[in-house]
Amino acid sequence: MNHLVTASMVALSVATPIAASVAAPGAPHDKLVVGMTAFSSSQHPYIDPVIVKSWTLGFVNRPVTYFTPDTWTNTCALCTELPSIENGRAKIETQANGKPGMSVHWTLKPDLKWGDGVPLTTKDIAYTAKVGGDPTTGFPDARIWGRIYKTDIIDDQNIVVHIDEVTPLFNRMSKLLSEHIDGPTYTAAKSPGDYVKQNAYNRAPTTPGLWNGPYMMTANDGASQIVLQPNPYWSGSKPYFKNIVIRSIGDTAALQANLLSGDIDMIPGDGNGLSLDQVLAMQKQHPTDFNYIFNDSVTFYHLDVNLDNPILKDPRVRRAMLMAIDRKAMSDRLVGGRYQLAATWVPPKEPMFAEGIPIVPYDPAGAKKLLQEAGWTPGPDGILRNAAGERFSIEYDTTTELKLGLLIQQVAQDQLKRVGIEATIKNEIQRTFFGDTLKRRKYGGLAQYFWLFSVSFAPLQLYAISNIPTEANGWGGSNYMDWKNDDFERALQASATDLDVGKQKADWAEMQKIYAQDLPTLPLFFVPQTHVIPVWLKGYVPAGMTDYASLRGEDWRAE
């Protein structure tokens, strides 16, 4: 699972009518001001990954490979050819310890340079692999960089990396660190944690030699604003804007006010921006002042089910709970039908999506029947009881900050009560909910939040048995449900090692089938990204996943 897995939700706010201030026709647009609600003080590509930073770095630090926005297909950004078994660039080999591994031959495009004119070479790949494989550096991307145990530099453009496992992720390579700028800091680090604090990206983020994209970071006040300007050594399409300003504005109400007043030009939907309901209200009030884009995404909104609770161990009970919730009505009434109902965690646009997995329908009568089959019958107060007289009463948790989530929770609570299930709301601030309650399984029944997935990334972190948080593993992993399904585990582990695309799809289809039957989480919706951009901005193509629209920032222009 993911490198940048984000667990958060969008907030509800009532849009206040404000007259929109837009530039006069013919006015020059050589500056683009982007507004977000968050800011990252760290600019290191891997340490402390957050959405706003990754979105910003799309302009200035290009990965070796990325997924295209239209078909979500892995493709080269800095390389000449995507390695594969078929073209001979990837091979299975035997490691010195006798275990199978892989060798992968990468070739960088010619004329790549950092922002100071120094050539970008295979030394930068080797350096990034070295830092990424060091457990003291704080890299979360262990399955991308940590699996590389050796690099063989052939020349400045060619390198062979050796991977300690057989994995379908062999031909993915993310952002590179600048060896000639950042390397001395890593070499000088004397104790664990020194590099995390002193790396060049955090100390001097406006150093030109840190960046290899169409833009460079030329100003960073460390609190609320970053300025990007064209990289004179960029070898690709010439970027249009002289300045791109990324500005952090405290909350969504202020963000919207700044947009309507003209202080900012746009709010991206793949960053920390406006909620769906805010954008819908704004579109109604200002239909022609901006372009509004709603695109499918990998954002999976769901309810984790605590399987430590004996009441919730029966799959029939979990299915009945999902049948009791009218997800379509929620989507229609709260967000104008923009939520896409989910059958599993895999969205239809995902290349590994399995056709034929039915979406559990809203069927309260069927839910009552299933609950009765599972041994639950109504008590005198209307709440179900089992043969031992135990009431069907569970806790229902989400975060206090997210207003639209609270509305969804209230509707679901009421609908569950109609079939005899008492769901007691127990909400917490995000820091407590994500930092303690989920991973220690302190929630008593249901936990409502969303995940943002990477494309075709085997969901080991979420569903592998080894990723059930425990005291023994330092409460690591995100299988917060304590889900143990041997059939799913076999398909999951196979999906993480099968190189044949056909076999991978079969593995994923099996996982989706088992998930839909067992329902360790209750799938609710896929949440679309909502982008508000100026009518004069062209070339803006949102992706709906973690390879953000900024990765094609050189194509943005004003017309």
Language-model segments: residues:
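Detector for C-terminal structural segments
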Residues: D30, M36-A38, I51, W55, ...
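Aromatic- and charge-enriched surface segment that lines or borders ligand/interaction sites
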Residues: L82-G138, V160, L255-N258, I311-K313
